[in-house]
From Swiss-Prot:
Keywords: CF(0), Hydrogen ion transport, Ion transport, Lipid-binding, Membrane, Methylation, Mitochondrion, Transit peptide, Transmembrane, Transmembrane helix, Transport. It is linked to This protein is the major protein stored in the storage bodies of animals or humans affected with ceroid lipofuscinosis (Batten disease). This is ATP synthase F(0) complex subunit C2, mitochondrial. F-type ATPases have 2 components, CF(1) - the catalytic core - and CF(0) - the membrane proton channel. CF(1) has five subunits: alpha(3), beta(3), gamma(1), delta(1), epsilon(1). CF(0) has three main subunits: a, b and c. Interacts with DNAJC30; interaction is direct. Trimethylated by ATPSCKMT at Lys-111. Methylation is required for proper incorporation of the C subunit into the ATP synthase complex and mitochondrial respiration. One of its GO terms (biological process) is proton motive force-driven ATP synthesis. The gene is ATP5MC2. It comes from Bos taurus (Bovine).
Length: 143
């Protein structure tokens, strides 16, 4: 039993099996047939075969294309998340002027002070919206 386990789990067999399993199916099928020597016919030991690397450049090209697609998707997701801030700016402006109307209805004597606060709130909200829009354009076109 021990000799059988020793034969099945030789380091060269493990190394060769792990590299074959990690390669694509087309790379395994397209391999060139290796010639066996007289030594390998006579003994039961596993002879390590050289691995072909004919498909390695095409695999790295596919990986770079996938990497570019992931980068492009990340750009669009980031720009979309930054654009949400523009919608938040619109909601903020609506809240500011809604509060102005409610405040004026409650106390008409503070009309001038409420209006100046409303303009300040509008300016801050609009500035944040423009900042978010600028970040979205930077993500799309500068990165």
């Amino acid at each position: 039993m021990y000799t059988c386990a020793k034969f099945v789990s030789t380091p060269s067999l493990i190394r060769r099996t792990s590299t074959v399993l990690s390669r694509s199916l087309s790379a395994v099928v397209v391999r060139r047939p290796e010639t066996l020597t007289d030594e390998s016919h006579s003994s039961l030991a596993v002879v390590p075969r050289p691995l072909t690397t004919s498909l390695t450049p095409s695999r790295s090209f596919q990986t770079s294309a996938i990497s570019r697609d992931i980068d492009t998707a990340a750009k669009f997701i980031g720009a979309g998340a930054a654009t949400v801030g523009v919608a938040g700016s619109g909601a903020g402006i609506g809240t500011v002027f809604g509060s102005l109307i409610i405040g004026y209805a409650r106390n008409p004597s503070l009309k001038q002070q409420l209006f100046s606060y409303a303009i300040l709130g509008f300016a801050l909200s609009e500035a944040m919206g423009l900042f978010c829009l600028m970040v979205a354009f930077l993500i799309l076109f500068a990165m």
